[in-house]
């Protein structure tokens, strides 16, 4: 037993970037067999000298979360026990709380939150708008086939505009008057030959991009008045819109589209590739080959990394800046079935959420590949889409006809304040 | 006499020891002659002698040549002497005296020369004394270095020519007056022997009598000279015969390690020595050849051989190495089989439980004819005492059997081939290197309420269609597992097949006796509409169909209520349809009705709404049919065999022999050269159509009947589904190189289907693009493995 633990004592330096939790930078000798709990007690004891209340911390050892015993962690990383080890501690991200369950008539395949509204797309061909308090505002029929993706174009006090795509091969541009609670279909975007599976609105909200099963990536104008003259008059009246740009390059269905910046698009496809498109060049800037079909890909503006969900149980982290191609930065194991959807936090640099066919959502820290931070349970069926656009709420829709809302309890606002 | 001596000069000793000796002898002979002359009887017939001499000379005339060959120096001299002889012969008749004088002259001159070599006289003695020659020692004459070596040498015969009978015991001639014969075959008369008185008188009168001896060979008397006597005396006193000999002469080392400036002999080298010898060259070349051919060995080799022979010698301890039998018996004896130890039953007084009861006895008797089946080979018996045990009744028979065993027992141990089992397994690549292939179950499509018979994937890979025994056809979205549409039919759905042409949106559904062409209304709306238009109305056909086809098949548009479900065309068959399969272009489709006898396989043409019955005769119970992906070929599987027909030429191309009892399914490689066949007797057969009509490989991977088998369109993969609930995914690489055989590696066994009523997996089908496989099972589910 002694030999097993027998690494004896390890010298550690405790550091933090959160100033108000700082402890004096002196080396502490601690047992090698300690885990997070013991470290927490120890650190809290140190802090209590300063009269602070008890806080839960997570410990980062060499840029990776400490999950088991310290000695195991060090052994795995092949770090000598003789060295003084720097342990960075951060306040533990508080567990998101299930807040609401929004019941639908059919599978919910698309969710998007913005402000206090939640937009959902449903397999019964309707779009629904909910408040984040769980109040159903509106059901919008219009599509003739299941909705596959929705996205907000703009939202203000008076009007909300959003776009929805569906298996009926169209994308629809909607304008919603909040006060009168009336919704208008501004235009129908026709051009795709198969189901439109993904949509993304450009940062300036002037354009949006759709990816479809017909392998095409199409760009559309998001203006209320389509700036096409003359011949499009008739089309405008009928509300039919044609793509501004069509980008061909994928060999299979495009399952994920995201704007990286005003002129750069990220797409993920079933043909096992991630592509970064430059809209000025109208071509491919970077291509990352993977070995699985990609179901979802998400790019973080904070750390400029891409996390993908593909046809297996793992989430993978890619760096689009590397030239070597498919360098997987990290693999996140935890789900038990296909991961269908993934999204970075818009405020926390290291956090992202994922939804999987094993009926679970998981909240991950990208520095903790072995285990997620939290499992967000609640769904009784496959999770089809997840959204964390609103930092306060994690919203996911699933095949159990519900949308689950989890309140991300950590007041990101607080966090901002501390910064 | 003079002539005789002259002739004698020519004669040389054939066995002359050396030059010097011969020279001295010759010179001595001359002296002897004088001596002999003196004792000679005056009355002797000289002519006779002459003749003998001549004869003798002619006999040895060859030696003359020899002599001259030996020493070139003699040549001139000999000629001179011969000239002398000639001269002598001429004068023969004229004047004997002259000759004598001549002789004397030469003799004196010889004597002069002899003076220098006094030892020569001693040598003469040996000749003259004949028998006593054993004491004669040839003394090398001391040469005067100032004189040329062979200056004075001339040879003459030293043989006693008066003896013609040779060296024989002379007493043989005691009774005769003569000794031998001369040239003219006349007797040579012995010299007269005086009586004792004469001897006595001579002893008194002759002062030299004491030194007169008789030559035993010739019987003549010889007068010994003073030198002879001195020599005899010296020999008798065991001194060195030559008085001149100085025993203590200073030693001159003639042959030393020192190289002298001047040659030892001052005779110039002969011309011959400067010329390369031809014969020597021949000899050398012969030796070189012999060396090359290995007939001859160099001295080094010979030396080495000798050295080796001298080294330690090894020899066989036993006779040979190959005579293994002898050694084997020592090292590796075949041990006799061990007999069981005797048990209680074998005792003469066994405990009662070992004795047979009635049941055991009955069993014993039952195996009367097959005694080897009995548990015991004897019947336990009980005796009161050992005395009562009878003699062993089967003794003789047992001996006989033992002998028989010995006769048949193996004499040598059978050598087992010691091959490592690993070695026999073909080297297959590791499955890890053959990725991607499905490894885990990813999705389960639930919704059917009875066993799902068939599944087919949309060519683009977004949807699947499944047909079930619950009389429904369901269309599913692959990625989410959502059932998009359920189409109810009137009968059990045996087979569904999505049209492989991506430009058409049709599903062929075999339900009962009807084949439904359904528009699934998924995917591209434009295609859906186009397909609807295409199927809306029947093209006018002017071909009159034969009665045979009419009774078998009827085409009709669907009823309005079925139209709503998506059914567009109904092809009603006369028997239940079991299988439907499309041609790659999507215009033709073939159906199988196992009960249709000679009309069990049908080919329908969609665009013309026509049906054909390709076969007029039934070749067996048709199980399934298949279109070749590239060529106009048609595969028909009956229970046991597969026939390949050319649809254009309408003839049988090939018949594949499966050697199995019941074929369940077929799948053809997208390139069209390899065919996979699944059978109900647990086998999967891989046919290389270019190779032979027999299976290239037979795989027995499943534990139960194999229901279905399928090739992937893009990846080198195939999968099989079986009643043992397993889907086995294998790697099946077909190489473009015709010389390389297909590589088959079983990769993964996927066993998640539940067993229901002895059925497991009923159908397998690959996703057209992804390495994903769909399997349908008796547990009412469709499962996706990725």
From Swiss-Prot, chain A:
In terms of InterPro entries, this protein maps to:
G-protein_beta_WD-40_rep, NLE, WD40/YVTN_repeat-like_dom_sf, WD40_repeat_CS, WD40_repeat_dom_sf, WD40_rpt, WDR12/Ytm1
Q: Which GO terms describe its biological process?
A: maturation of 5.8S rRNA from tricistronic rRNA transcript (SSU-rRNA, 5.8S rRNA, LSU-rRNA); maturation of LSU-rRNA from tricistronic rRNA transcript (SSU-rRNA, 5.8S rRNA, LSU-rRNA)
WD repeat ranges per the UniProt record: 103-141, 142-184, 191-230, 249-287, 289-328, 334-374, 378-416
Which keywords appear in this protein's UniProt record, sorted alphabetically? Answer: Nucleus, Repeat, Ribosome biogenesis, rRNA processing, WD repeat
The cysteines joined by S-S bonds are none
Q: What SUPFAM superfamilies does the record point to?
A: WD40 repeat-like
> Subcellular localization, per the record?
Nucleus, Nucleolus; Nucleus, Nucleoplasm
| Stated role | Required for maturation of ribosomal RNAs and formation of the large ribosomal subunit.
- What is the recorded name of this protein? Ribosome biogenesis protein WDR12 homolog
From Swiss-Prot, chain B:
Q: Where is this region: Disordered?
A: 1-161
**A GO cellular component entry from the record:** nucleoplasm
| WD repeat residue intervals | 447-488, 490-528, 572-614, 617-655, 658-697, 701-740, 756-786
Q: What is its main location?
A: nucleus
Instruction: Give the compositionally biased regions (Acidic residues).
Output: 44-53, 60-72, 82-114, 151-160
Q: Where in the cell is it found?
A: Nucleus, Nucleolus; Nucleus, Nucleoplasm
Q: Does the keyword Calcium apply?
A: no
Q: Where is the composition biased (Basic and acidic residues)?
A: 141-150
Q: Which Pfam families match?
A: BOP1NT, WD40
Cross-referenced InterPro entries: BOP1/Erb1, BOP1_N_dom, WD40/YVTN_repeat-like_dom_sf, WD40_repeat_CS, WD40_repeat_dom_sf, WD40_rpt
- Name of this chain's protein: Ribosome biogenesis protein BOP1 homolog
């Amino acid at each position: 037993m002694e030999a097993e633990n027998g690494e004896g004592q390890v010298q550690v330096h405790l550091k933090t970037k959160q100033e108000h939790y700082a402890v004096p930078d002196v080396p502490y000798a601690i047992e090698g067999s300690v885990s997070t709990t013991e470290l927490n007690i120890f650190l809290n004891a140190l802090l209590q000298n300063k009269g602070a209340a008890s806080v839960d911390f997570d410990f980062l050892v060499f840029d990776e979360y400490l999950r088991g015993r310290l000695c195991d962690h060090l052994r795995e990383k092949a770090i000598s026990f003789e060295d003084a080890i720097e342990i960075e501690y951060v306040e533990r991200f508080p567990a998101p709380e299930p807040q609401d369950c929004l019941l639908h008539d059919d599978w919910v395949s698309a969710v998007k939150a913005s402000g206090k509204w939640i937009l959902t797309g449903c397999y019964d061909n309707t779009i629904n708008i909910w408040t984040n308090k769980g109040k159903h505002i509106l059901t919008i029929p219009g599509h003739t086939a299941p909705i596959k993706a929705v996205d907000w174009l703009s939202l203000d006090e008076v009007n909300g505009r959003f776009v929805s795509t569906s298996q009926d091969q169209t994308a629809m541009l909607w304008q919603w008057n909040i006060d009168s609670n009336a919704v208008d279909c501004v235009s129908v975007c026709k051009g795709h030959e198969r189901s439109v599976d993904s949509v993304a609105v450009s940062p300036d909200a002037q354009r949006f991009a759709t990816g479809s099963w017909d392998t095409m990536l199409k760009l559309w104008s998001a203006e209320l008045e389509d700036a096409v003259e003359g011949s499009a008059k008739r089309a405008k009246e009928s509300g039919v819109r044609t793509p501004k740009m069509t980008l061909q390059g994928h060999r299979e269905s495009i399952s994920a589209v995201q704007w990286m910046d005003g002129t750069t698009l990220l797409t993920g496809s079933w043909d096992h590739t991630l592509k970064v498109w430059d809209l000025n060049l109208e071509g491919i800037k970077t291509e990352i080959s993977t070995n699985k079909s990609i179901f979802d890909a998400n790019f973080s503006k904070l750390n400029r990394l891409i996390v993908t969900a593909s046809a297996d149980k793992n989430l993978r982290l890619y760096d689009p800046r590397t030239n070597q191609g498919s360098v997987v930065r990290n693999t996140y194991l935890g789900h038990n079935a296909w991961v269908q959807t993934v999204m970075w936090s818009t405020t926390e640099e290291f956090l992202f959420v994922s939804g999987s066919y094993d009926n679970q959502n998981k909240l991950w820290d990208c520095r903790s590949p072995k285990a997620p931070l939290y499992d967000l349970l609640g769904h009784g069926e496959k999770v089809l889409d997840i959204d964390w656009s609103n930092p306060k709420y994690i919203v996911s829709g699933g095949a159990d006809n519900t949308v689950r809302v989890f309140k991300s309890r950590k007041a990101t606002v607080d966090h901002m304040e501390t910064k | 006499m003079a002539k005789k001596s002259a002739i004698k000069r020519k004669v040389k000793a054939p066995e002359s020891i050396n030059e010097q000796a011969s020279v001295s002898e010759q010179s001595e002979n001359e002296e002897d002659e004088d001596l002999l002359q003196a004792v000679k009887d005056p009355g002797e017939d000289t002519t006779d002698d002459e003749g003998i001499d001549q004869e003798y000379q002619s006999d040895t005339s060859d030696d003359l040549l020899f002599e001259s060959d030996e020493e070139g120096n003699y040549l001139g001299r000999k000629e001179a002497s011969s000239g002398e002889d000639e001269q002598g012969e001429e004068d023969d008749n004229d004047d004997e005296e002259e000759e004598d004088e001549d002789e004397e002259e030469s003799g004196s001159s010889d004597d002069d020369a002899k003076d220098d070599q006094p030892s020569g006289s001693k040598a003469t003695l040996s000749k003259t004394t004949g028998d006593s020659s054993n004491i004669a020692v040839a003394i090398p004459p001391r040469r005067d270095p100032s004189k040329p070596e062979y200056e004075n040498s001339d040879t003459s015969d030293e043989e006693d020519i008066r003896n013609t009978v040779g060296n024989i015991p002379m007493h043989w001639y005691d009774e005769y007056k003569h000794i031998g014969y001369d040239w003219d075959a006349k007797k040579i008369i012995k010299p007269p022997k005086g009586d004792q008185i004469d001897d006595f008188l001579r002893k008194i009168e002759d002062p030299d009598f004491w030194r007169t001896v008789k030559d035993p060979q010739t019987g003549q008397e010889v007068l010994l000279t003073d030198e002879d006597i001195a020599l005899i005396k010296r020999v008798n006193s065991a001194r060195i015969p030559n008085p001149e000999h100085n025993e203590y002469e200073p030693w001159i080392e003639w042959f030393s390690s020192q190289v002298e400036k001047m040659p030892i002999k001052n005779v110039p080298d002969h011309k011959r020595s400067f010329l390369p010898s031809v014969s020597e060259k021949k000899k050398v070349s012969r030796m070189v050849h012999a060396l090359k051919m290995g007939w001859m060995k160099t001295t080094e080799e010979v030396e080495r051989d000798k050295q080796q022979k001298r080294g330690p010698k090894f020899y066989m301890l036993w006779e040979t190495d190959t005579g293994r039998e002898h050694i084997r018996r020592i090292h590796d004896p075949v041990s006799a089989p061990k007999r069981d130890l005797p048990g209680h039953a074998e005792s003469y007084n066994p405990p009662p439980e070992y004795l047979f009861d009635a049941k055991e006895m009955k069993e014993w008797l039952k195996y009367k004819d097959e005694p080897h089946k009995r548990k015991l080979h004897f019947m336990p018996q009980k005796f009161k005492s050992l005395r009562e045990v009878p003699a062993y009744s089967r003794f003789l028979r047992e001996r006989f059997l033992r002998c028989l065993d010995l006769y048949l027992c193996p004499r040598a141990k059978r050598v087992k081939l010691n091959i490592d089992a690993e070695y026999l397994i073909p080297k297959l690549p590791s499955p890890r290197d053959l990725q991607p292939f499905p490894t885990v179950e990813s999705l389960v499509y639930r919704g059917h309420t009875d066993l799902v018979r068939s599944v087919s994937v949309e060519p683009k890979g977004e949807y699947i269609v499944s047909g079930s025994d619950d009389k429904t056809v369901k269309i599913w979205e692959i990625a989410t597992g959502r059932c998009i549409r359920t189409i109810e039919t009137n009968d059990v759905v045996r087979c569904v097949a999505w049209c492989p042409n991506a430009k058409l949106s049709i599903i062929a559904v075999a339900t009962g006796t009807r084949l439904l062409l359904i528009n699934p209304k998924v995917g591209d709306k434009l295609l859906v509409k186009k397909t609807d238009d295409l199927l809306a109305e029947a093209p006018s056909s002017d071909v009159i169909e034969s009665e045979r086809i009419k009774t078998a098949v009827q085409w009709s548009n669907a009823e309005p209520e079925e139209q709503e479900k998506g059914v567009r065309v109904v092809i009603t068959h006369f028997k239940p349809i079991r299988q439907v399969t499309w041609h790659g272009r999507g215009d033709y489709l073939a159906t199988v009705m196992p009960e249709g006898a000679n009309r069990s396989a049908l080919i329908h043409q969609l665009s013309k709404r026509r049906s054909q019955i390709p076969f007029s005769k039934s070749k067996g119970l048709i199980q399934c049919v298949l279109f070749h992906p590239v060529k106009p070929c048609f595969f028909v599987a009956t229970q046991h065999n597969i026939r390949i027909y050319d649809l254009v030429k309408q003839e049988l191309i090939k018949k594949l022999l499966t050697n199995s009892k019941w074929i369940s399914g077929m799948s053809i490689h997208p390139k069209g050269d390899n065919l996979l066949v699944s059978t109900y007797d647990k086998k999967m057969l891989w046919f290389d159509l270019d190779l032979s009509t027999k299976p290239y490989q037979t795989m027995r991977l499943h534990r139960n009947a194999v229901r279905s088998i399928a090739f992937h369109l893009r990846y080198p993969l195939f999968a099989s589904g079986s009643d043992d609930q397993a889907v086995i995914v294998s790697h099946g690489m077909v190489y473009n190189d015709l010389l390389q055989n297909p590589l088959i590696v079983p990769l993964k066994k996927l066993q998640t289907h539940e067993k229901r009523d002895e059925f497991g997996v009923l159908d397998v089908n690959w996703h057209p693009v992804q390495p994903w496989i769909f399997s349908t099972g008796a547990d009412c589910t469709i499962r996706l493995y990725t």
